[in-house]
């Protein structure tokens, strides 16, 4: 996974 990638993002 690329740096700064998050499976869950705060909306």
UniProtKB/Swiss-Prot annotation:
Indicate what this protein is called per its UniProt record. [Ala1,Thr6]-bradykinyl-Ser,Lys
**Per its record, what are the GO molecular function terms?**
hormone activity; toxin activity
Question: Which family is it part of?
Answer: Belongs to the bradykinin-related peptide family.
InterPro entries, per database record:
Bradykinin
Tissue specificity field: Expressed by the skin glands.
UniProt KW Secreted keyword: yes
Q: Which organism is this entry from? A: Physalaemus signifer (Girard's dwarf frog)
**Major localization class:** secreted
- What keywords is this UniProt entry annotated with? Amphibian defense peptide, G-protein coupled receptor impairing toxin, Secreted, Toxin, Vasoactive, Vasodilator
What subcellular locations does the record give? Secreted
- Any single GO CC term annotated in Swiss-Prot or TrEMBL for this entry: extracellular region
Q: What does this protein do?
A: Produces in vitro relaxation of rat arterial smooth muscle and constriction of intestinal smooth muscle. May target bradykinin receptors (BDKRB).
Cleavable signal peptide = none
One record GO biological process: vasodilation
Top-rank taxon of the source lineage equals: Eukaryota
Upper taxonomic classification of the species?
Eukaryota, Metazoa, Chordata, Craniata, Vertebrata
Does the keyword Secreted belong to this entry?
Answer: yes
């Amino acid at each position: 996974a690329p740096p700064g990638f998050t499976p869950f993002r705060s909306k």
